[in-house]
Amino acid sequence: MRNAKGFTLIELLIVIAIIAILAAVLIPNLLAARKRANDTVVTAYLNDAVKFQEMYQIDNNSYTSNQAALISLGLKSTPANVTFSIVSASANSYCMIAGHSGGTVWFAATPDKGVYKTNTAVTSSQPESCP
């Protein structure tokens, strides 16, 4: 009998099957983690925008519907792939909405509720008011 070196076809098929099973389990988890990370980018930006809205309100006795006014106070520009808008603003209230194209849902921010998740999927159009 010869001294065989290397792997048999069966051994290689078993290794390929194990790799396929691991990929089937891990890939969906990685995609979900990416969506959660994208949502975190949105909530962090909205939290910053809330702080700058409060700063603006202290100086002007009213909230602003102009993102440029918040940027002039120090708010960073909108992150890549994030849609952000100040839907409404008055002396006592504001409504800001944001979502990431690779995220799960739209997020909103108001003085009463702070930053919160809406029930509207990011794949649908942006809400026109804070729910």
Curated annotation (Swiss-Prot):
Induction: By growth in minimal medium or low temperature leading to a significant increase in pilA4 transcripts. The keyword Cell membrane applies. GO terms for cellular component: cell outer membrane; periplasmic space; plasma membrane; type II protein secretion system complex. The chain crosses the membrane at residues 7-27. GO terms for biological process: protein secretion by the type II secretion system. It comes from the Bacteria. Residues 1-6 form a propeptide. Found in three forms of 14-kDa, 18-kDa and a glycosylated 23-kDa form. Both narrow and wide pili are glycosylated. It is a single-pass membrane protein. Pfam families: N_methyl (PF07963). Keywords: Cell inner membrane, Cell membrane, Cell outer membrane, Disulfide bond, Glycoprotein, Membrane, Methylation, Periplasm, Transmembrane, Transmembrane helix. Disruption phenotype: Deletion mutants show defect in both DNA transformation and twitching motility. It is found in: Cell inner membrane; Cell outer membrane; Periplasm. Disulfide bonds join 95-130. The keyword Manganese does not apply. The modification N-methylphenylalanine is found at residue 7. Plays an essential role in the assembly of two types of T4P pili: a wide and a narrow that participate in natural transformation and twitching motility. Major component of the wide pilus that is essential for natural transformation working as a DNA translocator structure that spans the inner and outer membranes. In addition, participates in the assembly of the narrow pilus composed of the PilA5 subunit that is required for twitching motility. Interacts with PilQ. This is Type IV wide pilus major component PilA4. It comes from Thermus thermophilus (strain ATCC BAA-163 / DSM 7039 / HB27). The gene is pilA4.
